[in-house]
Amino acid sequence: MTQPAEQIVDPSRGPEILRLRQLSKTFRVGFWATRVQAVRDVSAVMYQGESIGYLGPNGSGKTTSIKCMLALIQPSSGKIELFGRSPTDPLARARVGYLPESPYFYDYLTPVEVCEYVGKLYGLDARTRKQRTQELLGLVGLDQAAKRPLRGFSKGMLQRIGIAQSLMADPDLLIWDEPLSGLDPLGRKEVRELMIELRRQGKSLFFSSHVLTDIEALCDGVCILDRGVAVAQGRLADLLRRDALESEALLDLPADPQLEAGLRAELAKIPGLALQQLPTGVQAVLPTQAVPALIQALMQGGGQLRELSARRDSLEDLFMRKALQRSDGGQP
Amino acid sequence: MSQHVSQHGLKLSIGGPAAILARVAAIVGNTVREAGRAKLFYGLLGGALLLLAFSVVLSDLALVDQKARLVQSFGMAVIPLMCVGTAILLGAVLLHKEIDKKTLYAILPKPIRRSEFILGKLLGLSTLLLAELAVLTLCWWAVLVLRGGELTAPMLRGMGLQYVELLLVTSIALFFSALSRPVLSGVLTTGVFIAGRVTYVINDLLSATKGVFAEVPAMRALGKLLVAVVPDLGTFSVSDQILQGWEVPWTYVSAATLYGLSWAAVFAIGAVLLFERRDFT
Ligand SMILES: Nc1ncnc2c1ncn2[C@@H]1O[C@H](COP(=O)(O)OP(=O)(O)O)[C@@H](O)[C@H]1O
Ligand SMILES: [Mg+2]
């Protein structure tokens, strides 16, 4: 189910830049130190130039694992390698641009001052800092507000300054926590376009999102988290293609109970076929190659085929299926 | 190794003393700026100035040849206390504010060590306290001159020693604020400060032949423990001796400074160790 990281190594890919080895984080909360397992045994690997979506609903452990990657949190067990180093090593973090989830900065600073400060922390010289600040504030559309204190900035504007500061040192890897949340549709579109542009420039992108729609175009690969566990990962094309090989059919079964039972028994013999009662009829989901067998069974058993279509999974379907599998599959 | 060149040719200096210094300086700059915006700081500064003004009024009541003396001893006692108040309050609040307002989350992921961050906070606060002490000393000098006195070299050296005490109190405050929440860390720092100011008294009591500290074994143990684990802040308060004409020789100043800075280093290292183990969730 969860692909071990080792299996998706591909020699055509660039150098490895990020690896999670069985990352786990347990928090202890409250007086009784109740254990909350935020992240469980997540393994993943990312190569230079890739764009990875880290997906899952709220509370699934995305932010916690991202904070581990930046050494804000110590893993309870497991290991992280960032550019082959520990995240606690400043040289590893020098190549990363981090956008926190709903970013906060000193509200008495102006965007120019935030960029200056961040530039100093990255060890950039004064001239480079000035030049980058100007470029980046232009890029995120903050040049008008460049000299106003952040106090009174809208959430969207704070997100923009967050993005600008994350790009300050021209990092190889961008780790962005929920870059698209809290933005209006136009802002979302702009950030998406920026992400596509950064990818074109060869930046590696690791970003989280709890919204699964409209990010398919942004990532080569995904890692889907559900309650702290990576339930699916790999190249998006592989994950979704596999599901394009499935078909779904809407059936009419014979009204006679005996005939119906007979037909159901025949259908049950088709490998990989699953029946589900929908308000509109009975739905069958089956491997596309088994469609002839389905039609034959229907013809012989007195049933009818009302609709037949290739099953195109969306990320949401994929997630729902994986999450359901997990709940049914006896995993705690 | 210590330099990284980015994809588009930007040069990042990360390792090496110069790069570390530059990062610490950036934190110092921001800390001074942040603390310098605190209403608390100006409140305490204003309070100290009021007290100095009050000492002028008070000195009117004193005998003619005692006027300057009163201002002198009043200043030597009150100015350091007000600065200690600043150190304790800002020290308790500064770190916590960074966590509370989540500004830390954008800073620590940068190529900076947590120890550098703590050092920057410590030096930033120390810079601010130096400014506060200097402003107050200048005002005190003006008042002294007004009352027919003068600011002598021993008095200046005495104030210098008080600054060493301030550095120590600041690192104690940072230590406790890396450990706990603001109110508790403020209380703890104040506790250590008061204990430190009175250890010399306890020391005297321990070596006396009578009294609870000399006679009750439990109190004796407690007293000894206190003397051992709490820095003797009496070392830095020499105003009484100055009034009696002591010169505060440089040998004493350097020994006391070494003593104070060593203790400050102990607490600063403790603060770093605590801070490095913390999760910022
Ligand atoms: N400091 C904390 N103490 C206790 N539990 C926490 C803490 N931070 C996060 N959690 C829990 O860990 C889980 C994952 O949270 P998070 O990583 O923020 O998820 P996501 O970013 O995917 O929304 C949640 O159940 C959350 O309640
Ligand atoms: Mg999150």
Regions found by a protein language model. Give the residues of each.
Chain A
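A short linear hydrophobic-aromatic micro-motif
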Residues: 141, 189, 271-276, 304-309
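C-terminal coupling/interaction segments
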Residues: 2-10, 15, 288-332
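ABC transporter nucleotide-binding domain
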Residues: 192-285
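A generic structural signal for secondary-structure junctions
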Residues: 28, 92, 123, 162, ...
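Alpha-helical elements of the RecA-like P-loop NTPase motor core of helicases
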Residues: 90, 107, 261, 292, ...
